[in-house]
Amino acid sequence: MTVVCLLLWAASNPVVAGCFDKREAGMDWSGCQKTNKMLDESNFSGSRFDDANLALSSLDDSNFKGASLVKTDLTRATARRSRFEGADLTKSVGYRAVFDGAILEKTNLVKSEYFRASFRDARITDTDWSRSELGRVDFSAAQLNGVSFQYSNLSRVIFSETKLENVDFEGAYTYLTHVEKVDLRAVKNLSQLQLNLSCGDLQTRLPKGLWIPDTWPCEE
């Protein structure tokens, strides 16, 4: 009878995985509420944050290598100079988040939402950012190599002084996307229609076969 009672109690009182564990590599904060926390200079490598809420938290100079942040809420969080090599941020949300100087390599950001986020001076390599909402993201002075923006919303994104190598624009929405003074000759699957929607200038370098639209430079 005692065993049955213990089993019933355990079923009705599930333990939240690791929410009160101290921060360290390989921990599990899945589903945890960690809003407005000071978590700078943390080693979160290999840790799990799936469905966690990290909104408004400071995560600067932290290590997220191989971490899982699926459906994690990073709204207005900061992760300046943090490392996300091999991290999974599928369906994560980072409205107005700040990732300036961050390193993302082989990172999964499919179906994520980062409206008005900042990735200034970030280094982003071999990363899948397809089918995502990236309106007004600031990539100024960032280095992007092997990034897929396939079928993502890039409206009003800023690529000022951004280095773009092997970046895939197939099906991306580029309404008023800023490419002034940007070299686009090494990008992939960029169409004339996408250029017509975007904002560039006479210093924008275009791939072979494409031309400067009559609407450049934009008035806004």
Describe the residue ranges of each PLM region.
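Tandem repeat scaffolds
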Residues: 15-220
